[in-house]
């Protein structure tokens, strides 16, 4: 890469959160037009009592959006053995209700705006995270992957919780990296109270806090090497000494050894568990089952009960053996996304360390183990953001052809458009 090209990439990366936010707005407009045209031509009918907002937002109100509408409007109920809203964690519907009250009880419009605002913040935070850990071109590709991932349509106005969960997850990590341990724990409450995979945030915050302690201790013990720095308006070069940087994550032994360095301020990240614990206490007190969000998954129609039938994907295997191609068209891409996620974990660990690898592992393990046929796994992979960064690393490696990343992004963009049309047409895409 020429020096001029390097400088151009550097300029882009310095403003990457701003550019990423602008790209998100442009894609929101484009996909909303596509969704509106699709909805008017092929979308299922909806009653005005539910959808009384602008058409470009109403088009995104499909699938489980109705459950969040019901929770925001009427609260929770639980009928054992039947599908019930306790399957859905409270952070997102509470946010929808809060905004909906401002909008005069228009819950569907509120749901769309909560998603859009959350997604805009999440994209900016991800861009900031990527630019501090990846080379300039790789960081740009990582942001593009987040925006164009086929299941990223859930970020562009749907009544789903993915955008808010991604925002609170990235926010808690951003605060942790700045040593705001209490604030990281408080924002983490929204994440663990946002969806079942919120437990991944709790685990990862703890691991990352330990990792930061281990890194600080290693930096103090590392030999110092001379470097030249530029200071002053005249560009005077001065000698300085900095710790020698060690490539890769800290050894596991040092990570475990950092436990004895923990102080009360680091323990504050454990506050993030309050979201999940509070939800379980509510379910236990009101419905007599603190794990109702797990129990209800086995209700007829969802049939996501735990056990070997679910763990070993018996239904998915049967679907493959019977050659049920229309169903496989929906399930196979999500199974491939899970496979790609598993394969990317080592790269995420080498590049981003133990904490982010722990988040990725737990995030993808829950849908892989907990779904009977991989349905829903595609959007669960969306929030495993370290894997998106790892995918960008793979696509832009030194041994990769320059056309590989643009080709992959182009293919992803086509998939995003197809998934959007299918979703708005009432197809259960993920």
Task: Give the predicted meaning of each segment.
Residues 59-77, 81-104, 307-316:
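Short hydrophobic/aromatic helix or loop-helix immediately within or flanking a transmembrane segment
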Residues 98-101, 113-133, 340-346:
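Transmembrane-helix motifs of polytopic, lipid-linked glycan transferases
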Residues 114-118, 134-137, 141-174, 183, ...:
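Multi-pass, polyprenyl lipid-linked donor-dependent membrane glycosyltransferases
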Residues 1-50, 261-271, 404, 408:
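Start-transfer (signal-anchor) and selected internal transmembrane alpha helices
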Residues 83-90, 94, 102-121, 155, ...:
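Loop-to-helix entry region of an early transmembrane alpha helix in multi-pass inner-membrane enzymes
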Residues 106-109, 126-148, 167, 354, ...:
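Transmembrane-helix signature of polytopic, membrane-embedded enzymes
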Residues 28-44, 60, 202-343, 355-360:
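Membrane-lumen/periplasm interface segments of specific transmembrane helices
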Residues 270-273, 397-428:
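Signature aromatic-anchored transmembrane alpha helix within multi-pass, membrane-resident enzymes
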């Amino acid at each position: 890469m020429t020096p001029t090209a390097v400088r151009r990439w550097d300029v882009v990366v310095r403003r990457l959160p701003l550019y990423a936010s602008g790209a998100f707005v442009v894609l929101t407009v484009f996909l909303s037009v596509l969704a509106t045209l699709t909805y008017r031509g092929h979308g299922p009918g909806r009653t005005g009592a539910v959808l009384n907002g602008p058409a470009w937002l109403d088009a995104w109100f499909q699938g489980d959006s109705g459950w969040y509408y019901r929770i925001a409007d009427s609260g929770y109920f639980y009928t054992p053995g039947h599908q019930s809203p306790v399957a859905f964690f409270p952070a997102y519907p509470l946010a929808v209700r809060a905004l909906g009250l401002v909008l005069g009880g228009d819950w569907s419009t509120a749901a769309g705006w909560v998603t859009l605002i959350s997604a805009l913040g999440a994209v900016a935070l991800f861009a900031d995270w990527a630019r501090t850990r990846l080379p300039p071109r790789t960081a740009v590709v990582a942001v593009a992957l987040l925006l164009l991932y086929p299941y990223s349509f859930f970020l562009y106005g749907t009544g789903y919780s993915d955008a808010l969960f991604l925002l609170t997850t990235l926010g808690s990590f951003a605060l942790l990296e700045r040593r705001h341990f209490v604030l990281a724990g408080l924002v983490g409450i929204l994440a663990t109270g946002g969806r079942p995979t919120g437990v991944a945030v709790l685990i990862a915050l703890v691991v990352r806090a330990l990792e930061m302690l281990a890194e600080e201790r290693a930096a103090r013990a590392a030999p110092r090497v001379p470097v030249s720095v530029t200071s002053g308006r005249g560009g005077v070069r001065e000698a300085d000494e900095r710790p020698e940087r060690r490539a890769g994550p800290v050894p596991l032994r040092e990570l475990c050894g950092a436990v004895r360095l923990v102080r009360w301020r680091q323990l504050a990240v454990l506050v993030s568990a309050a979201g999940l614990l509070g939800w379980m206490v509510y379910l236990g007190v009101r419905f007599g089952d603190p794990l109702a969000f797990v129990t209800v998954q086995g209700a007829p129609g969802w049939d996501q009960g735990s056990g070997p039938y679910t763990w070993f994907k018996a239904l998915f295997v049967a679907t493959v053996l019977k050659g049920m191609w229309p169903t496989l068209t929906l399930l196979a891409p999500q199974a491939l996304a899970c496979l790609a996620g598993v394969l990317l974990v080592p790269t995420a660990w080498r590049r981003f360390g133990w904490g982010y690898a722990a988040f990725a592992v737990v995030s993808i393990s829950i849908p892989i183990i907990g779904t009977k046929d991989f349905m829903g796994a595609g959007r669960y992979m969306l929030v495993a953001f370290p894997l998106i960064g790892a995918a960008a690393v793979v696509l832009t490696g030194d041994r990769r052809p320059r056309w590989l990343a643009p080709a992959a992004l182009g293919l992803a963009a086509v998939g995003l458009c197809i998934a959007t049309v299918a979703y708005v047409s009432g197809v259960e895409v993920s």
